[in-house]
């Protein structure tokens, strides 16, 4: 492990910064507070849209700038401002759907989009739109059901395809070879049959690099924590990429260091080495 303390700490949220109960533990909150008071910068990098950040930020004594939607949105919660957004065009989303639709002709599936919106308070049904067969999660309390044509009519931070009968890894193996990288970046952040598409070349590393530049910090002075394939580029870009013990195998293999699980305060274990 590096002996020099990082200047920027970046953590994924689900499966990493939060414990399995969705909480920031007192131990983790304390060490992050010590790091910030010592002069380090801190940020969260998540697949979540920025409107889903408040339950996490409410557990912290400060409101860090966050990288959201897998790097497509950089958001300042203190002023409720989108600092940067990388959006998929309607044309690109249409091309993606044309490419992947034949792969799922015989299984139930649906599409959704996450639009950026002007604020974290923008009504959810204006930002989260789904097709009839999408089958939203229980926590998706508000959404608009639209046609595919309406879904992709305006730019979006993310396009998603859901197939409940498959794992995300199996879907990824089918989808990745047929999607032109010039149309979209392909990844996933959960195991339950959900694939996420973003602007070409945009991933968490993109958003984190924007944040690092904002603070005048170079990649070698960044430590990043993650657990799922949508964290891979961020971990590779950072001077030190740390995987949680509960991480996907591909993430464990790619990381510079493996810490304890999110149930065992793995992020705090590493940060306490410096702070």
What is each stretch, according to the model?
Residues 15, 35, 70, 159, ...:
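Residue-level signal for inorganic ion chemistry
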Residues 103, 108-225, 229-230:
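Conserved acidic, metal-coordinating active-site core of Asp-based
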Residues 23-132:
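Active-site phosphate-binding/coordination module
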Residues 5-21:
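Asp-based phosphoryl-transfer active-site loop
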Residues 38-43, 62-64, 158, 220-222, ...:
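Short active-site oxyanion
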Residues 13, 71, 226-228:
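Active-site metal-binding loops of divalent metal-dependent hydrolases
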Residues 28, 53-57, 171, 175, ...:
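Hydrophobic packing residues within well-ordered alpha-helices of enzyme cores
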Residues 3-8, 25, 197-275:
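Mg2+-dependent phosphoryl-transfer enzymes with acidic/Ser/Thr/Gly-rich catalytic loops
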């Amino acid at each position: 492990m590096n002996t020099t303390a990082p200047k920027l700490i970046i953590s994924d949220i689900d499966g990493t910064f939060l414990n399995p109960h969705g909480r920031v533990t007192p131990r983790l909150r304390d060490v992050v507070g010590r790091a910030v008071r010592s002069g380090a910068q801190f940020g969260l990098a998540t697949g979540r849209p920025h409107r889903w950040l408040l339950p996490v930020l409410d557990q912290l004594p400060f409101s860090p700038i966050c990288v959201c939607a897998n790097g497509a949105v950089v958001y300042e919660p203190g002023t409720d401002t989108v600092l940067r957004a990388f959006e998929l065009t309607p044309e690109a989303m249409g091309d993606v759907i044309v490419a992947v639709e034949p792969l799922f002709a015989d299984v139930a599936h649906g599409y959704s989009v996450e639009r950026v919106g002007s604020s974290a308070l923008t009504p959810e049904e204006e930002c989260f739109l789904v097709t009839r067969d999408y089958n939203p999660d229980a926590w998706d309390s508000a959404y608009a059901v639209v046609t595919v044509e309406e879904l992709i009519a305006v730019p979006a931070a993310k396009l998603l395809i859901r197939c409940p009968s498959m794992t995300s890894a199996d879907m990824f193996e089918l989808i990745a070879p047929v999607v032109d990288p010039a149309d979209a970046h392909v990844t996933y952040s959960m195991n339950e049959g959900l694939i996420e598409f973003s602007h070409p070349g945009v991933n968490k590393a993109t958003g984190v690099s924007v944040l690092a530049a904002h603070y005048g910090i170079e990649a070698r002075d960044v430590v990043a924590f993650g657990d799922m394939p949508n964290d891979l580029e961020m971990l590779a870009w950072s001077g030190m990429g740390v995987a949680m013990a509960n991480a996907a195998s591909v993430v464990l293999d790619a990381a510079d260091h493996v810490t304890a699980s999110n149930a065992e305060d793995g992020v705090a274990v590493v940060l306490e080495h410096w702070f």
